[in-house]
Amino acid sequence: MKKKIIILLSVVIILLMGIVVWFNIPLDLMDLDPNEVMEIVVFNGNSGNATHITDKEQIQHIVENLNGVELKRSKPSLGYMGYSFKVTIYLSDGNEAGDWNNFIINSDDTIRKDPFFYSVTKGNIDYSYI
């Protein structure tokens, strides 16, 4: 009986350590080739206006900026409403970019991609440009 409790506690501790490591591991925001991007749609949550960016120079600036950003999970985002900018990226084939698509930029150092808020740990988001 004692042996089962020790094994169970060991498994629980290992699982908790794994969750802590997973939660704290840094993530790249994206890794896209700017030449593969056809359009970036930025929806302003403050005004309700959407901006469709198709200019290649603007796309290159935004994608290269976001490619250089590294993030870390900071807290759960469930239950939070409202945002500054929602970013959707469309590729040359007309499909949305995978993984980090439809994310929300709340500030120059905070991104929301449910179910978490993410803090910038490397690089910076050119918030004023977006």
Language-model region placement:
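Positively charged n-region of N-terminal signal peptides that target proteins for export
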Residues: M1-K4
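Short, surface-exposed linear segments at secondary-structure transitions and domain or protein termini
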Residues: Q60-E64, I105-D114, I130
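Hydrophobic membrane-insertion alpha-helices, especially the h-region
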Residues: I7-W22
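N-terminal export/targeting and maturation segments
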Residues: G18-L78
